[in-house]
Each structure stands twice: as structure tokens, then as C-alpha cells.
Amino acid sequence: MYHCSLERMSDKIHTFSKFGDAGHGGITRYALSAEDKMARDEWVKRMTAIGATIEMDDLANMYATIPGSDPNAKRIVMGSHCDSVKNGGNYDGILGVMSAMEVLETVVAENIPHKHPLTAMIFTNEEGSE
């Protein structure tokens, strides 16, 4: 049986909660702001470290993909947004991003066989900006 890493997930929660933390509760991480870019840069660093291929579309949605055993199989996509409203919840959106990251990290770390390419995704501007 395979298990996600509590240590890896705790590290992600600790690290990503810094991006947009003004020190008074909640997170302010507007889409495409400096704080959003810091979170995205960290995501790219971690996904690149496991060998994922990184792509960005014309709307700045980002994709990290690890190949499956069948190059013709449709990819499985999971993820969320990392932007927030002003003083938004610490885990709103970003928890889905971190969970998708953990799936890919676990598949790679545990060498789990899989047919379909697996993609972690960050959606851009889900919350809208001020």
C-alpha cells in the first residue's frame, strides 16, 4: 500500500503559508502578484525536482506532468488555484495545489506504475483581484 508523506505535506503547508501572510491572520495573495509569483516559483522548483515537465498556457495556468506508461493515454489533471481574496483562508485553493503536488511526488518517490500521464495544475485568477 502506498502512502503520501506527512513530512512532505507539512513542509508544503509551512512553506506556502508564508506567501502572502501579512502577519495578522489570513493570506492575501492576489492573482499574478509578487506573492502569487513566489508560490508559483516554489511550485515549479518542487515539480522540476521530481522530473515533471512544466508548461504554462496563454492564461498563465500552469501544468506539471509526469509521463505514464501509455503515451497515448489521456492525462489525469488535478489541482486548484493559489490566489486568494484579501485576508483569505490559509488553505483556500492552495490546499488543492499542494495535494496534487503530493500525488505526483508520491508516485515518483514510491515508483508507482501508472498508465496515464499525471498532471498537477495551478489555475490562474480563480478568486479575481482587487
PLM regions: where:
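N-terminal capping segment at the start of a domain
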Residues: 2-33
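Alpha-helical metal-binding/catalytic segments enriched in His/Glu/Asp
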Residues: 78, 88-127
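Catalytic-core environment of secreted peptidases
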Residues: 50, 62-92, 100
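N-terminal glycine-rich anion-binding loops that anchor highly charged ligand groups
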Residues: 11-21, 39, 54, 71-76
